Amino acid sequence: MRGEVCHIHIGQAGTQLGNSAWELYLLEHGLGADGRLDPEKGEDINAGGSFETFFTETGSGKYVPRSIFVDLDPSPIDEIRTGPYRQLFHPEQLISGKEDAANNYARGHYTVGKELVDTVVDRVRRLSDNCSSLQGFLVFHSFGGGTGSGFGALLLERLSTEYGKKSKLEFAVYPSPRVSTAVVEPYNAVLSTHSTIENSDCTFLVDNEAVYDICRRNLDIPRPSFEHLNRLIAQVVSSITSSLRFDGALNVDLNEFQTNLVPFPRIHYPLISYAPVISSNRSSHESFKVQDLTLQCAEPNNQMVVCDPRNGKYMAVALLYRGDCVPRDCTQAIASLKAKASFNLVEWCPTGFKVGINYQKPARVPGSELAPVDRSVSMLSNTTAISEAWSRLDHKFDLMYSKRAFVHWYVGEGMEEGEFSEAREDLAALEKDYEEVAGDSLDMEGEEAEY
């Protein structure tokens, strides 16, 4: 028994990411769209996978996901209620409001969100009572929207009071440098980050622009849709949890991510990269050796946030291998990665690598552009380069806030203006934390010289 994981999908981004993630989980476990075992898949799949982690089995042999979908706007959840997976989810796990948060953090956090949050916490309690040893929560939401930022922050506050000791990992869609879906994104993101720094154990950032570029460049999709993006992100989410569900040489559970990736409590924003992202018509010309995939993950253009890790230092890296891999190959691949000049580890963390190896091959969604492959690597790296992303965001926030543009919408929903400056100061402190961590080694040398 490896412990269960509850998924919580918040807002439109979280809900659509959830759709892609569950689509993939069903394939990996050989289940049909109604949550029953697919007779065509046969018995072989069932042998290796543990269903309990993500699914509750009912008396009639149906598997129900341990997940909750919440949105203040009814339409994304209605899509699930009428979509191909309407038989899969428990109707009580799909919670929608009457009016949306209108891209406004304050509506999601104070006015509209307040009415729904008790219902949601109650549903979470029911899910967790159903678990024999709950490992933790995976929370999916965006930082730019109203529900994702406001309600997401509110729910995480409640979760950390009720489930303080359980891991809470977030997958957050972060505002991109050039692709924007809302004018007030910088406000929402700064406010949301401020309130989740304390309440989340580890937050994996994904930004749409970076994933767009990966889809365009590697999958030859001229105009990628959100579905393409979500399917790619789902592969990473699946690798992170694959050890909980399938057997492997080195298994990794949720607590190990925190232990190995988060050197200081506030610095918990790892980057994600995934390889191989390749289309079916190119795959015959490529080598998928463990070493090649590992080096691909370290390339800036395979990362899911627009920032250049060559400008920063790595504090900790988790490499999750999946499929046909043996530990020896992985060790060699890591050695060659460490030898690269562009790969800088901080001096106070000499080992720096956590490895997971899982024997389950990456599954491929029928009709997706990703080529079927025998092995894949996900790299989660906590690097100081991510502070580039924070400073970009802070700069946009400052431009708008200097004129107090759009602030009245937030104040009108019961927020105080002081909260803006408080949140902004907190993020300035976060940037400072990252600078100090990167510069620590230099101070040490100065001190030694004095003695």
UniProtKB/Swiss-Prot annotation:
Cofactor(s) for this UniProt protein: Mg(2+)
The keyword Metal-binding is annotated on this UniProt entry: yes
Residues the UniProt record annotates as site (Involved in polymerization): 451
Active site positions, chain numbering: 256
GO cellular component: cytoplasm; microtubule; nucleus; spindle
Reaction it catalyzes: GTP + H2O = GDP + phosphate + H(+)
Record's keyword terms, sorted: Cytoplasm, Cytoskeleton, GTP-binding, Hydrolase, Magnesium, Metal-binding, Microtubule, Nucleotide-binding
GO MF entries: GTP binding; hydrolase activity; metal ion binding; structural constituent of cytoskeleton
CDD domains hit by this protein: alpha_tubulin (cd02186)
Keyword field contains Magnesium: yes
EC id: 3.6.5.-
Binding site for GTP: 12, 73, 142, 146-147, 181, 208, 230
Locations listed in the record: Cytoplasm, Cytoskeleton
Binding site for Mg(2+): 73
GO biological process: ascospore formation; meiotic cell cycle; microtubule cytoskeleton organization; mitotic cell cycle; nuclear division; nuclear migration by microtubule mediated pushing forces
Family: Belongs to the tubulin family.
Role played: Tubulin is the major constituent of microtubules, a cylinder consisting of laterally associated linear protofilaments composed of alpha- and beta-tubulin heterodimers. Microtubules grow by the addition of GTP-tubulin dimers to the microtubule end, where a stabilizing cap forms. Below the cap, tubulin dimers are in GDP-bound state, owing to GTPase activity of alpha-tubulin.
Subunit structure: Dimer of alpha and beta chains. A typical microtubule is a hollow water-filled tube with an outer diameter of 25 nm and an inner diameter of 15 nM. Alpha-beta heterodimers associate head-to-tail to form protofilaments running lengthwise along the microtubule wall with the beta-tubulin subunit facing the microtubule plus end conferring a structural polarity. Microtubules usually have 13 protofilaments but different protofilament numbers can be found in some organisms and specialized cells.
UniProt-recorded name of the protein: Tubulin alpha-2 chain
Protein source organism: Emericella nidulans (strain FGSC A4 / ATCC 38163 / CBS 112.46 / NRRL 194 / M139) (Aspergillus nidulans)
Phylogenetic lineage: Eukaryota, Fungi, Dikarya, Ascomycota, Pezizomycotina
